[in-house]
Amino acid sequence: MPNNYIFKNFKNNKAYKLQLLEVVKKMCNMEIGGYKFYDGSGTHYMQNPNEIVNLIFHLKNFEKKRKIKLENFLEIGFAAGINNSFLNKFFNFKKIIAVDYVSPGGINKETFFSNLRFKNLTLICADSTKKETIKNVSVLGPYDFIFIDGGHSYE
């Protein structure tokens, strides 16, 4: 029986990349290049589809070129965990550390709780800019991949 999940059958070619881009567009709202209108539910994927697909291809090529597997993932800015879960489907990280405030506003609780499951995740509920948080996160490293998508204050 063939495995029809797009993340299980990664192919480093243009046709697969276009197919993956269409999948990501369907997950995103129109404001960021997708097909869905944002309804305020916090259940949409909040990344630019082209950027996330290019990132996945870049990381897969990095693994192949270096003959390594990305195993330890640090994400700064977990939000509802959609990005975290999506990347984990492609890389099946051995260890995931995520740092973010846990704020009830703007995040769908069902999406949040569903994205805490089925992976080796440690969620640190703290301010990623504080020295104590940085120290705690450092102790849990080293990391093969760090994705920064938090603290959008630009201060």
What is each residue range found by the language model?
Residues 1-147, 151-155:
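A short alpha-helical cap/connector motif
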